[in-house]
Amino acid sequence: MTADIRVSIDRGGTFCDVIAHVEGREPIIFKLLSVDPANYQDAPTEGIRRVLEIVEGKKIPVGEKLDGTRIASCRLGTTVATNALLEGKYEKFALVTTKGFEDVCVIGDQSRPKLFDLKVKKAEALHDTVIGVDERVTIEDYDLNPYPLDKSASLNDPDLVRTPSGEIIRILARVNEETVREQLLALRDAGYNSVAISFMHSYIFPDHEDQVAKIAREVGFTYVTTSAETRPVLKYLNRSTSCCSEACLYPVIRRYIENFESGFRVLPRRVDFMCSDGGLKQSQKFRGNEALLSGPAGGVVGIATSCYDVEQKIPIIGFDMGGTSTDVSRFDGKYDYLSETVIADRTISMPMLNISTVAAGGGSILFARSGLLVVGPESAGAHPGPACYRKGGPLTVTDANLFLGRLVVSSFPSIFGENADQPLDQDVVTAKFQEITADFNSQTSQNLTAEEVALGFLDVANEAMSRPIRNTTEARGFAPEKHNLVSFGGAGGQHACAIASKLGIKRVLIHKWSSLLSAHGISQADLQYESFEPLSLDFGMDLNGFIKERLSLLREKVAAGLLAQGAQESTLRFDESLVMKYFGTDTTITVTTPDDLDYGAAFEALHLREFAFKLNRKIVIDSVNVRGTGSAVTLATEEPPLKALARVKSVATTAQTTEEQKVYINGSWRKVPIYRLDQLSKGCAVSGPAMIIDKTQTIFVEPRFNAYILPDHVILEESNVEDTVTRQAVSAEEINPLLLSVFAHRFMSIAEQMGNTLQRTSVSSSIKERLDFSCAIFSREGKLVANAPHIPIHLGSMQMAIRYQHEAWKGKLKPGDALVTNHPLSGGTHLPDLTVVSPVFVNGDVAFYVASRGHHTDIGGKGIAAMMPESKELWEEGISIKTMKIVSGGEFLEDEIRAAFDKAGSFPGCSPTRRIADNLSDLKAQIASNQRGIILLGNLCEEFTLPVVCTYMEGIQANAEFAVRRFLKQLAKKHPEPLTAIDYFDDGTPIKIKIIIDPETGGAVYDFSGTGPQQWGNYNCPISITHSAIIYTLRCLVDVDIPLNEGCLTPIDIRVPYGSMLNPSPAVAICGSTLASQRVIDTILRAFRRCAASQGCASSFSWGMGGRDPETGKVLPGWNYGESLGGGVGALPGYHGESAINVHSTNTRNTDPEVVEKRTAVLVTKYAVRKGSGGRGQWRGGDGVTREIQARIPLKFSILSDRRVYRPYGMEGGEAGHRGQNYVFKFNQEGTGFEQINLGGKAVVVLNPGEKMQINTPGGGAWGKPEGDADGYREEDQAGDGI
C-alpha cells in the first residue's frame, strides 16, 4: 500500500488543528476540541481517524486501533509539556545537588514577579525532595584577578584539571560512591523513579554528575537526568531548573508518545514532534524541555515559510492572537533564537525561538477602574468564557467585537449555553456594556455611549498587544513600519488592521490557513539537530585552526544525528557559529562564521549594530555551535506572497456580495458588506470597511484598507484614500477618558524600552544581571509621568532629581546634552545610584525629560564597595555630584567624569573607583537608554502633536491623583481616626508616623514628627526615600493597576522634621538609606494595619581587594563585588509569607553562585532557606536565607544590615520573625578549626584563605495567634521589640 498521507497536527489548549496532505487531492483541514472525553480519548489520534475516514471513504469506529500504513509522516505539536508544568501534573522526582545548595531552586533569583503585590508568590520548586552530595569543584582562576594565572602552564597538582573548554578547575571534594549509593537507594525505597542531578560547575566538568548518574541507573532509577546533559551552560540556578524541568517532563512526554502510538495497530512510517527551536525530532528522541514551546514554534515556522517573501526580503512580524494571550515573533530570513526563556515563571535554558507573549487576547476581561479602561491581564478562559458564551462569564474583548458588530453571529455554530445548543448571546452583552458604561461615566463625569466605551476598550486592547511588538522591534533598533504584519490565530483577523495602523505598518498578510498556521508550520518544518561545546578562550586569529577543528567535529556529530532521524543527505544544511562576548560581561552574541574567518571583527560589528558602542576589552569565546537542518520529505512551495500581490493588483476585480451588517466605526453605525472567503474569486479586491469570514475566522477590513484575495493569502493594504467618515482627531484642549489608558500604555512602553536598552547595553552585573536600575519619563516641569516597574525605591525619588536639574539648568541645555547626579540634596537615594538625565527637545524647546538610574558597585570612597558599613560622613562614601554635564551636544565628556571619580579618591583614606571602565560603560548605557526614550517620545509627538502628548501626560497624573484620593476617602469612612505607628532601627532610633486623612477631599497628612535625629552613621535617609516609600505603599494598598506618577503624591502633605533621620543634613553618610527605606515602608504599612513586617532589610554583602593601602597610601589594583540578600515576607490574613525573596523597596536579583565563583576569588559554601526563621502564627511569616562565602585569598568583607536587634513585628497576635545574624568563622589559634564570631549588623572584616562569612537574613512576622499559643510564645514576640 502506498504511503501517500502526510498529517500535521497542533494540539493547543482549546483546539486541535489538523492539516493532511494527500497526493492527488486538496489538503484536508479541520479543527476539533483538544479535550472531549465524552467522544474520544486523544485528540490527535481522533484527528488521524477522521483523516483516514475521509481518504479511505469508510467508517472507522472511534477507539479502534488505526492502521497507519498509508501515513508517510505524522507531525505533532503539543501543549502536553507546558500544561504539565503549569498545572503541576507530572511525576514526582528527586533532585541531587552539591551539598550546601539543596535550596537553590527554592530560592530562585530572589526577585518577586509582581512588584506591588503584598501577597508575594513565586513559582514553586519542581522537585519533590532533595539530597546534597558532598562533592565540590570550583574554577581555579577568576575573571577579575588583576594578576591572572597562566592557563597554559602544566598542571602538577592532581586536584587541578584542564577542561575541554580551556578552563582549569580544582577538585575540592570527590564523590564518595558508597555514600551516594546509600542516599540513592533510600530515595528508591521511598518510591522515587526519576532523579535530576545538578552539581556546581558541571557545565565544564560533568564528571561528578556522570559518576552519580551511573550509580542511579545501577540502583534502578528509570529516568536519570543530568544538568550537563540537559544544557551545559554557565549559571547553576538556570541549569538546575532546566534539569528539573526535563526530569519532570520527560516521563510525561514518554507516556504521551506511548499512549499516542498505542492507538495504532500499524504505526505511521514516521512520527515526528515539533521542538521549541522550530525543528522536528523523531518521537524516540523527543525530550521534555523541547516540547515547551512546541505549538508557538510551529506558528513562527508557519509565518516564515508561508508569508516571508524570499525575493523582496521585507521582514515580518508574527501576530498570533488567541483567547488568553497574544504571541509576537519576528523573522527576517533567519530565525531568532533565545538561549533561555521564562516559562511558567521559571527560566529554562534551552534553544527556543524568540516569542514574546502578552496577557491580552479575545478572552481578556474588561474593567472600568478609577476612571481608566483596563483590559486584562485576567482572562475568562474557556470556562466560563466571554459573556456571550451563555455561561455567566464576564465582559471580554470578544464581547466588545460582538457588541460593535465585528462578529457575524450566524457564522458561529449554536454550541453555547447550558445544553450547548444556543447561539452567541447578544442581549447579555448589550446589558453588561450598558452597566459598565454607566459605571465609567460615574467615575469620569462623562456621558459616553456604550458603543464609545466598547470601542475604547478595543483601542486599549490593541495598544496592549502593540507593546510586545514595539519591544520586539523598536527596542532592538528595528522600525516597525519597515515590516509586514502577519496575522494568525483565531482572533487576529479582527484586530490586524488596527494593530498595523498603530505601528505604522501598511500591509497585513493573512494566510488561507491562518487559524491553523501552527499546524501548517509544523507541516513545513525541517528536522533539526544542534550540538555545541562550551569554551572559555580569549579570541585571537591564531585560534582559527582550533576553531575549524572543533566546528568540523561538531558538524560530523550533527550530520550523524540528522541522518539517524531519516533526513535525506542532499537536504542537509549547517549553520556554524561562535558565541562570543567581551571579557567581564555576560552579553553574548552569536557570530556566524564569516567569509574571512575574522570572528573578532564580525563580533565587534554586530555589537556596534546591536548596542551602538564598542568596548576596549578582549573578546572571549563562550562556545562553538553547529545547528543542522534536513528534510525527510520534499515539500510543495507556494508562490511568494508579494509577487502574487503584484500580479493581482493591476487586474483585480471588485468583489460582490448581498450580505451586510451594521458595524460601529469611528462614532457611528454603518452598513458593512460581508464576504464569504470560500465564495470570493482569486484575484478580486475588497474595500474596507468590510468583513471577510470563513469557517475558522473573521477578518475585519478597517476603513482605508483594501483586501486582495490571492490563491494562498488575503493581503490587507492601507490605501491613500481617506474614508468618508473622518477619523476622530485627538484634541489637546479636552482629555478624552477613553484614550487615557492608550496613552498610559504608550508612556509605559517607552519606559520599558529604555529599561530593555539599559539592561542590554550595560556591562556591570549590578545592572545587567541583578537589574538594579530604573528608567522613567518626565514632563517639561520634571514631574514623573511613567516609569517601568523596576526598583521601587526609585519611584518617588527620581522626580526630585529631575526637578533639581530642571531648575539648575533652565534655559541652558541644548539638544544632545545629558546630566549626571547622585547627591542627596539633588534627589539622590544613596551615592551608588547614579542618575543620568537627558532633556527631550521638540521644536527647539525642552518638552520632556528622560532619566535612567543605575546602581554602580564601586564609586570610590573608604569602603571595599559602595555599600560601606563604617561611613559617618558623605565624603567617605565616594563620588557625589549635585549636577554635572556628562554629554555636551552629543559628545561624551569622559575626561570630566574621570576627574570626578578620581576626586572621590583624594580624601583621607579614600580610594578612587577600582572599576572605572565599568563605570564609564554603564554611564554610556544609561545615555543610550535615554536616547531610546528621546527617539520614542519624538515619534509620539509626531504621531499626536506635542500639545496632545502634554495634555495626556497631565491627564495620566490627574488620574493617579483621582485613584489615590478615592482610596483614601473610602479608608477614612471605615477608619476616621488618625493612623499611627512606631518602629525602631537597631540603634534604638524611632521611626514615627501619624497619618490624618481628610474624608471629604481624600487628602492626607503624613507626619513623621517624633522620628529620631540624624545619626553618626549611614542609615540616614534623604527625603526622597520617604517620598518613594509613600508612593510604593499607596500603590500596594490601592491594589489595582494605577499609573505610578507625580499624581499619586499630589494629595499627600509630607511633613518630615529637618535634621531627623528621614530628612538629614547634607553632611552625614547615607549609603544605608535604601536598606533603611525597608523600615520606613514597614512602619507605614503598620499604621494601615495591612500586614506584618517583612524582613525589614536588604542585607548588603560585599567583598573585594585592592584600593588605597592605609599604611603606604599607594592605590593597589583590585576589584569588588556585592549583592543584596532576600528574606522573609510578612504575613497577612489568608496568606503565609513567602520565603527567601526580596521585599518592598528592593527587587534586585541575586548573583548566580557559579558566576560569583567565576568572577571573584571566593567559594559559595552555602545558600539555603533559613528554615523556621519566619514568625509563627495563624498565618506564618516567610523564612529568611543563609548565604555563606569562603575566601580563597586574603579579602576584605563587609556587611551592612539591620533587624539584627529588633525583630520584624507580627500583627494581631502573630509572632515576630527571627532577627538576622551575621557571623565570621575565623581560624582558631591552633589552626585546627574555626571560632564563630557574631559581627552585629554592620561590620568590616579581613578574612584569610579558608575563613568564612555567613549572613542569616531575618524572617517575616506572622499574622494571628499561633494555634494553642504554646511552646514558649510570649507577648513580646509579637512586638518584635525584644533583643
From Swiss-Prot:
Q: What processes does the entry annotate via GO biological process terms? A: glutathione metabolic process; melanin biosynthetic process
**Keywords tagged on the record:** ATP-binding, Hydrolase, Melanin biosynthesis, Nucleotide-binding
Recorded family membership: Belongs to the oxoprolinase family.
What role does it play?
Answer: 5-oxoprolinase; part of the gene cluster that mediates the biosynthesis of dihydroxynaphthalene (DHN)-melanin, a bluish-green pigment forming a dark layer in the conidial wall that protects the conidia from UV radiations. The first step of the pathway is the production of the pentaketide 1,3,6,8-tetrahydroxynaphthalene (1,3,6,8-THN or T4HN) by the polyketide synthase PfmaE though condensation of acetyl-CoA with malonyl-CoA. T4HN is not stable and easily oxidizes into the stable form flaviolin. T4HN is also substrate of the hydroxynaphthalene reductase PfmaG to yield scytalone.
Key word Nucleotide-binding present? yes
Does the record bear NAD in its keywords?
Answer: no
Q: Where is this region: Disordered?
A: 1256-1283
Q: Which GO terms describe its molecular function?
A: 5-oxoprolinase (ATP-hydrolyzing) activity; ATP binding
Q: Give residue spans, biased composition: Basic and acidic residues.
A: 1266-1277
Q: What is the recorded name of this protein? A: 5-oxoprolinase PfmaA
Q: What happens when the gene is disrupted?
A: Does not affect the production of scytalone.
Q: Which GO terms describe its cellular component?
A: cytosol
Q: Which InterPro entries match?
A: ACX-like_C (IPR049517), Hydant_A_N (IPR008040), Hydantoinase_A (IPR002821), Hydantoinase_B (IPR003692), Oxoprolinase-like (IPR045079)
Q: What catalytic reaction does the record list?
A: 5-oxo-L-proline + ATP + 2 H2O = L-glutamate + ADP + phosphate + H(+)
Q: What is its EC number?
A: 3.5.2.9
Highest taxon listed in the record's lineage: Eukaryota
Subunit text: Homodimer.
